[in-house]
Amino acid sequence: IYAGCSAGAMILGREIPDFRTMGMRSFSAFGVVPVAFVMPHFDAIPLFAKPLASALRNRLKPGEIMIGVDEDTAIIGKFNEDWTVFGKAKAHVFTKTESKSYSAGEKFSLGN
């Protein structure tokens, strides 16, 4: 079992974006969750930083996923099983070409 919030959630993906370069570079992360990037506080990203999410999405390769998790929200799941959204807001799952948002109680797959 692992719980992470904010930076503790970001480190679960494969990479952590370098905010100083607006996502053009990144640092290796733990790769515990089968996604390229985990973006916490997704609904609270300030307007000036919105291009970061676009830059990260553009870096995704076919089959890769980026997750945005809103504030006061969590996703809980296991490998090879669906993940469930808990909390007040939504979780957002992005590929390079598609996006889908899930509310509390909804389930989604990370394609694993």
Regions found by a protein language model. Give the residues of each.
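Catalytic nucleophile loop
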Residues: 1-15
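C-terminal and late-domain segments of enzyme folds
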Residues: 16-112
